[in-house]
Amino acid sequence: MEKLIILLLVAAVLMSTQALFQEKRTMKKIDFLSKGKADAEKQRKRNCSDDWQYCESPSDCCSWDCDVVCSG
C-alpha cells in the first residue's frame, strides 16, 4: 500500500513538472509572437504620414480613424 502511495505521489510530481514546462514553452511562444507584433507596430508608426490623407481602412491612418480621410 505504501509503495502505491509513493508511486502516485511520484506520478503527480512528474505530471505537474511536465505541465509547468509546457506552460513555459507556451509563454515563450506568446512572448516571441508579441515581440513581432510590437516590431510591426513600430514599423507602421515610422511609416505613418500626416493626418488628412485619403484612407480605405483605419489601419491606413496614424490615428486609426478613417472616414474617407484620416482624422485624429
Curated annotation (Swiss-Prot):
Disulfide bonds join C48-C62, C55-C66, C61-C70. Residues 20-44 form a propeptide. The lineage of its organism: Eukaryota, Metazoa, Spiralia, Lophotrochozoa, Mollusca. Keywords: Amidation, Bromination, Cleavage on pair of basic residues, Disulfide bond, Gamma-carboxyglutamic acid, Hydroxylation, Knottin, Neurotoxin, Secreted, Signal, Toxin. The presence of a 'disulfide through disulfide knot' structurally defines this protein as a knottin. The cysteine framework is VI/VII (C-C-CC-C-C). The modification 4-hydroxyproline is found at P58. It comes from the Eukaryota. This is Conotoxin Gla(2)-TxVI/B. The keyword Disulfide bond applies. Brominated at one of the Trp residues. InterPro entries: Conotoxin (IPR004214). The modification Serine amide is found at S71. Belongs to the conotoxin O2 superfamily. One of its GO terms (cellular component) is extracellular region. GO terms for molecular function: ion channel inhibitor activity; toxin activity. Expressed by the venom duct. The modification 4-carboxyglutamate is found at E56. Residues 1-19 form the signal peptide. It is found in: Secreted.
